[in-house]
Amino acid sequence: MRFMTLLFLTALAGALVCAYDPEAASAPGSGNPCHEASAAQKENAGEDPGLARQAPKPRKQRSSLLEKGLDGAKKAVGGLGKLGKDAVEDLESVGKGAVHDVKDVLDSVL
């Protein structure tokens, strides 16, 4: 669960950096999709314009990644809420059992 949260935050930070300033996001060849997309567009500048239109749009990719990350975060938060409720119920049941055990011990002693 922590890994998914860190993954989501990393993806969100990367998307924000790319959206803010793609040239400052990374150096060439570092594997950053924002930089690679802009480099591919520069390489295709002298080619047929129809070929340049076939490149995927990074904004759609980023928005789908953000949506997936948000869905994952919502599921993680929902899971934490359920886990907390289960823990409280377990503690209450253990507490009730312990109270009855103490009463039984006191009754037997007195």
Swiss-Prot record:
The chain crosses the membrane at residues 64-108. It is found in: Secreted. Its EC number is 3.4.-.-. Residues 1-19 form the signal peptide. One of its GO terms (molecular function) is lipid binding. One of its GO terms (cellular component) is extracellular exosome. Its main location: secreted. Glycans are attached at residues 30, 38. Residues 50-62, 110 form a propeptide. Gene3D superfamilies: 6.10.140.580. PANTHER family: DERMCIDIN, DERMCIDIN-RELATED. This is Dermcidin.
